């Protein structure tokens, strides 16, 4: 059998290796989450026309395109830089929260550089809080967005049966679904970041105890 000190060193080596592998996967999935967040923010496919809608078209957070009359040609309007052009105050609020989520997760990626200068555990915990805040912003954005479905522009596309949280003849599109999936992603990543941060704290404590026993 191996001496206790050697067994402890082997365990610690495997522990560090596994933590690093999980940390790399966490960083990769954080980057993918950032891409998803950006796509959800910029793509205008949150809701769209259906078989029975009066007009063709689709809506995003701030950009939307609607047909006119019998023509299938779409007229597009709306820009985040022109906040007043967004057709509903609910859409404006949703745009703000989804935009904040995007900024937070991109800032989290920027914090990866801190791994070279700061305690690994501290960086993980900072990123964990950022990801949790990003997930919270996504929740708020996704919950507020349907409150704007009673806007005149949405009713023109989806029919008079459209109202707050009632989509009428339209349907939910992929960008909205992706944003909802992003909430779960953010929660899992933030939980993993806190776990990794606490594991790093535990590893540092073990190293300090090992140094003390070695000196003794």
From Swiss-Prot:
Principal cellular location given in the protein's record: membrane
Q: Which InterPro entries match?
A: LHFPL
Where are the bilayer-spanning segments? 22-42, 96-116, 126-146, 177-197
Q: GO biological process: what's one of them? A: sensory perception of sound
Q: Name one Pfam family in it.
A: L_HMGIC_fpl
Identify the gene encoding this protein.
lhfpl3
Where is this protein found?
Membrane
A single cellular component GO annotation: plasma membrane
Protein family membership: Belongs to the LHFP family.
Under what name is this protein listed? LHFPL tetraspan subfamily member 3 protein
Topology in the membrane? Multi-pass membrane protein
Q: What are the alphabetically sorted keywords of the record?
A: Membrane, Transmembrane, Transmembrane helix
């Amino acid at each position: 059998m191996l001496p206790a000190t050697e067994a402890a060193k082997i365990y610690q080596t495997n522990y560090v290796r596994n933590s690093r592998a999980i940390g790399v996967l966490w960083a990769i999935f954080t980057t993918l989450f950032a891409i998803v967040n950006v796509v959800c923010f910029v793509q205008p496919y949150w809701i769209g026309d259906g078989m029975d809608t009066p007009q063709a078209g689709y809506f995003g957070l701030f950009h939307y395109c609607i047909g006119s009359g019998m023509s299938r040609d779409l007229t597009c309007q709306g820009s985040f830089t022109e906040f007043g052009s967004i057709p509903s105050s609910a859409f404006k609020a949703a745009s703000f929260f989804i935009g904040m989520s995007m900024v937070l997760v991109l800032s989290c990626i920027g914090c990866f550089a801190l791994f070279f200068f700061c305690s690994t555990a501290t960086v993980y915990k900072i990123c964990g809080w950022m990801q949790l805040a990003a997930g919270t912003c996504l929740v708020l954005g996704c919950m507020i967005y349907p409150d704007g479905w009673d806007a005149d522009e949405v009713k023109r596309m989806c029919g008079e049966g459209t109202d707050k949280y009632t989509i009428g003849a339209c349907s939910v599109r992929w960008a909205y679904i992706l944003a909802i999936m992003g909430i779960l992603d953010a929660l899992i990543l933030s939980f993993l970041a806190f776990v990794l941060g606490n594991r790093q704290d535990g590893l540092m404590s073990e190293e300090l105890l090992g140094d003390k026993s070695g000196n003794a």
